[in-house]
Design a protein with these regions (language model features):
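ABC-family P-loop ATPase nucleotide-binding domain
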Residues: 1-29, 235, 239-250
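ABC family nucleotide-binding domain
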Residues: 19-21, 26-228
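Flexible, glycine-rich phosphate/dinucleotide-binding loops
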Residues: 132, 218, 234, 242-243
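H-loop (His-switch) and adjacent beta-strand-loop-beta switch element
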Residues: 225-238
Length: 250
């Protein structure tokens, strides 16, 4: 297990051979006996390094569960998940903590900002988790937070709070950013603004991203669109260029 973490560290600043994220025949169930429900059913997908991948599907299709198992927040019943050359399914509890701390960033629907810290301080606290964080001022400027850096979360709009949450996730230079419905609590105009910001971050910093969303507006921004139904991938479309309208109508 220690070797798996070591391989992650060796790959942190270099290209990874093959897919950066590889999910192979993953199954995941919840409950026991007659109440047992299979949420992921032999699900497989691959995401290249630096790619922005959208995960679309109806509520209950398994999208959030997929992020949870890729992020090491939940165990699989069977199958294998590799991220950056690291076999996540082979990691023990302490190694999973290292994996989440050192290699992943998380952005959720609700921002979970520390209310008595300013925007700058919220970001700074997370930067301490990395030995080589991004330049905080550059990140604040890139995410359009310069005018709000010394404000508290209660003084921000929903979109501004989500920008702060994204900056906080990015400052420690994660290899993989996992976003679970990052625009779910926002109005349609702000949602498109945040999705465009995630695309900008992806292009600027080369961060590999998995974004779970109901928002079809993201599809034109993505390198790959994966659609999930009843716990399985029903379609996956993508290439080296942004997707055209005809490509995303599946």
């Amino acid at each position: 297990m220690r070797d798996a973490i070591k391989r992650c560290r060796q790959n942190q600043d270099g290209a990874v051979r093959g897919p950066f994220v590889s999910v192979q025949d993953v199954c995941k169930s919840y409950g026991l006996g007659e109440g047992k429900a299979q949420v992921l059913k032999d699900l497989s997908l691959e995401v290249a390094q630096g790619e922005l991948c959208a995960i679309l599907g109806a509520s209950g299709s398994g999208k959030s569960t997929l992020l949870n198992v890729v992020g090491g927040l939940d165990e699989v019943d069977s199958g294998r998940i590799c991220v950056g050359g690291c076999d996540v399914t082979a990691l023990g509890p302490s190694q999973l903590l290292e994996y989440r701390r050192d290699f992943l960033g998380f952005v959720f629907q609700f921002y979970n900002l520390v209310p008595n810290l300013t925007v700058r301080e919220n970001i700074q606290v997370t930067s301490y988790l990395s030995a080589n964080p991004l330049d905080m001022q550059e990140l604040i400027e890139t995410l359009g937070l310069s005018a709000h850096a010394d404000k508290f979360p209660s003084q921000l709009s929903g979109g501004q709070q989500q920008r702060c949450a994204i900056a906080r996730a990015l400052v420690k230079k994660p290899q993989l950013l996992l976003c679970d419905e990052p625009t779910g609590a926002l109005d349609s105009a702000t949602s498109l603004e945040i999705l465009g910001l995630l695309e900008q971050v992806n292009r600027s910093f080369g961060t590999t991203m998995l974004i779970v969303t109901h928002n079809e507006g993201i599809t034109a921004m993505c390198d790959q669109v994966v659609r999930i139904k009843d716990g399985s991938v029903v379609s996956s479309v993508g290439n080296a260029h942004k997707l055209s309208a005809s490509e995303i109508e599946l």
